[in-house]
Amino acid sequence: MADLLDDVWGSGDDLDESTRELSPDLLKLKDNHSKRGYLDGIVSAKEENLQDGFDMSFPLGAELGLRVGKIIGRLQGLEYRYGKDDEELKKDFNNAKQELQIKNILTKRIFTEDYNLEDSKHPVVSKWEEIVTKYCEKYNVKTE
């Protein structure tokens, strides 16, 4: 007969049928431990993957945030100075505030599985950088 400590639940292969039958309390305890172990494994894996994803994508996210900040800041300055005479500029400034929200910038569809940008450029950010450049040239504003 096998040592009962080989399997804390007493369910080793060498045990006879009468020993394998566990009390309802022991079955419930076994089920609870199994579920807890499963959940702990899932949580641990998620935490590890979340940290890895954060570590890999933080530099790119920070760069995109800086670029978005420059776009909004420049458009805000231009709109403040020239917006009363330029309806298109006012409209573009309001559109930029909507399109450049974080939910539109850090969307899954724009990134590869390796947390890189598709085609090495962000379509929304690049679009607005071009628009800002157009306005800066129009009003002869130096940005660098």
Curated annotation (Swiss-Prot):
Residues 37-77 are annotated as: deca-GX3 motif. It holds the Pfam family Yae1_N. GO terms for biological process: protein maturation. GO terms for molecular function: protein-macromolecule adaptor activity. InterPro entries: Essential_protein_Yae1_N, Yae1-like. GO terms for cellular component: cytosolic [4Fe-4S] assembly targeting complex; nucleus; Yae1-Lto1 complex. Keywords: Cytoplasm, Nucleus. May form a complex with LTO1. The complex LTO1:YAE1 may function as a target specific adapter that probably recruits apo-RPLI1 to the cytosolic iron-sulfur protein assembly (CIA) complex machinery. May be required for biogenesis of the large ribosomal subunit and initiation of translation. Belongs to the YAE1 family. This is Protein YAE1. It comes from Candida glabrata (strain ATCC 2001 / BCRC 20586 / JCM 3761 / NBRC 0622 / NRRL Y-65 / CBS 138) (Yeast).
